[in-house]
């Protein structure tokens, strides 16, 4: 890929994107490739719009349990922001007593749109929360109930239907090779939750993490369009299963001629016949009411 003209023919039926969150050029190129007929995994339009706090809000509405979570305004802003004009609708100071009463301690302070364990802090009391929040800079943050889990599971998901639950240790940030660590009831809860989230979010490639406490699986992190699927991370036997599942899914997408355009207004303008404006092309303009 190099200089990309606005009109180009698709060279591929399917592209699997695992880098555009770090290299913006790829994201821009993939959107245009999608217009040209390539099916991109994951959908670059939705990936650009998605973020973690929306995911928590969505999960609560589709019946997937999540920890109590509060979205927080940024602590600081770029110099061009005038607090008196641009921030006059923000509550200040924040109602920390009400926020912490709802979430409880300990809690996790993390970016509302982040990943890779960056800028994540565990806070045990209000002074620790203030210290971590004051250091968060211009990031919009979330404060989330900490689940003191009995088990922790990360599901690698491909094509919305293939779901591979693997025991995970978030303290050491590594997978654990274990068998039969979930009861049938817990396994069903995890698989059903991951399935619902993948379908609701529209992800063809994702990882969904659950913290399990007292028989309840809480979805902790599930908006991961480029999940860690490296052979050194997920263990060779799991890596083989995931690669095979992704290969089968990519071939299926290519054969079916899938599109990323479903639900987007521009789709109808890429088809024939195209919609026509009122007056059947004779021209129209907005006029003030009399």
List each language-model region with its residue ranges.
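ATP-binding N-terminal substructure of ATP-dependent carboxylate-amine bond-forming enzymes
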Residues: 1-41, 45-50, 54, 78
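Active-site nucleotide/adenylate-binding loops and adjacent lid/helix of ATP-dependent enzymes
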Residues: 34-37, 45-153, 159, 179-180, ...
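Phosphate-binding core of ATP-grasp and ATP-grasp-like enzymes
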Residues: 136-140, 146-177, 191-207, 211-218, ...
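Glycine-rich phosphate/pyrophosphate-binding beta-alpha loops
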Residues: 20-21, 223-239
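A long amphipathic alpha-helix within ATP-dependent nucleotide-binding catalytic cores
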Residues: 173-219, 241-244, 248-258, 267-279, ...
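Short loop/turn motifs at secondary-structure junctions
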Residues: 11, 65, 202-204
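Short secondary-structure boundary/hinge segments and terminal tails
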Residues: 5-8, 51, 76-78, 117-118, ...
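Generic enzyme active-site microenvironment
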Residues: 15, 41, 108, 207, ...
